[in-house]
């Protein structure tokens, strides 16, 4: 990514998919879709300029492969609506270049986009955001950041909203993320939280931007 602002503009575009999931469970996808698979909500968005294939597996498993060093996608499984839950996941995440593995989602009233980043590729998404402290949770330390998006895509259409980030210093793929610890730490840092309503989903997301790689994640 060339800059934090341009990166987030592209990443934020990934959440424009409808908050109302389709009734049909789809397995292998190459175009944007939301729905339910194996009892979990899934969201897959791609800008169409790279080569990306998303697959819904059994229960909470999904996989995604991408190539071509072009484009942006966001994909994963989780819950709609989200909640203060302990998220346990396992699997593999192998980006060649820029990519994120995170617990990702939205809050409303106020509108907030959030990331709890477990691992990333060549670009740390907190590089150009405002650092607000740290939080220790689930055996690791996370740096807290805040940024604002102005007239950007969201689950409520074009809007101005804050982004909250927790980025793990010790990268890992697999474990439990106690989301309440992050939400509480954000509040203590002066960041106003919203509610889990009006399509405010939560997924364990794989994201890629102008890169290649593979990811196979199971949400438990």
Swiss-Prot record:
Residues covered by the GH11 domain: 28-220
Species: Penicillium parvum
SUPFAM superfamilies (UniProt xref): Concanavalin A-like lectins/glucanases
Active site: 113 (nucleophile), 207 (proton donor)
GO CC annotations on file: extracellular region
UniProt keyword list: Carbohydrate metabolism, Glycosidase, Hydrolase, Polysaccharide degradation, Secreted, Signal, Xylan degradation
Subcellular location: Secreted
Cysteines paired by S-S bonds: none
Organism domain of life: Eukaryota
Protein name: Endo-1,4-beta-xylanase 3
Activity modulation: Divalent cations such as Ca(2+), Zn(2+), Mg(2+), Cu(2+), Co(2+), or Ni(2+) at a high concentration (5 mM) slightly decrease the catalytic activity. Fe(3+) shows strong repression. EDTA and SDS also inhibit the activity.
InterPro entries named in the record: ConA-like_dom_sf (IPR013320), GH11/12 (IPR013319), GH11_AS_1 (IPR018208), GH11_AS_2 (IPR033119), GH11_dom (IPR033123), Glyco_hydro_11 (IPR001137)
Annotated pathway: Glycan degradation; xylan degradation
Biophysicochemical property: temperature dependence: Optimum temperature is 55 degrees Celsius.
Documented applications: Thermotolerant xylanases have many advantages in industrial applications including higher specific activity (lower cost of enzyme), increment of substrate and product solubility, and decrement of microbial contamination. XYN3 provides a potential way for industrial preparations of feruloylated oligosaccharides (FOs) or xylo-oligosaccharides (XOS) from biomass. Synergistic reactions with other polysaccharadide degrading enzymes are important for industrial applications.
Major place of residence: secreted
Similarity annotation: Belongs to the glycosyl hydrolase 11 (cellulase G) family.
């Amino acid at each position: 990514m060339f800059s934090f602002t341009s990166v987030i503009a592209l990443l934020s575009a990934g959440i424009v998919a409808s908050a109302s999931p389709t009734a049909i469970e789809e397995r292998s996808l190459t175009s944007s879709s939301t729905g339910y698979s194996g009892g979990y909500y899934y969201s897959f968005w791609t800008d169409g300029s790279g080569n990306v294939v998303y697959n819904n597996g059994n229960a909470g498993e999904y996989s995604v492969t991408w190539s071509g060093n072009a484009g942006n996608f966001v994909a994963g499984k989780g819950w709609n609506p989200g909640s203060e839950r302990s998220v346990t996941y396992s699997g593999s995440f192998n980006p060649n270049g820029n990519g994120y593995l995170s617990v990702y989602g939205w809050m409303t009233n106020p509108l907030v986009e959030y990331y709890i980043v477990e691992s990333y590729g060549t670009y740390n998404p907190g590089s150009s955001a405002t650092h607000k402290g740290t939080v220790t949770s689930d055996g690791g330390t996370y740096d807290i950041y805040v940024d604002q998006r102005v007239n950007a895509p969201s689950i409520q259409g074009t809007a101005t909203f804050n982004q909250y980030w927790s980025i793990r210093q010790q990268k890992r793929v697999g474990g439990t993320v106690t989301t309440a610890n992050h939400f509480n730490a954000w509040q203590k840092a002066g960041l106003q939280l919203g509610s889990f309503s009006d399509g405010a989903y939560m997924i364990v997301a794989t994201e890629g931007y102008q890169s290649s790689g593979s990811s196979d994640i199971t949400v438990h």
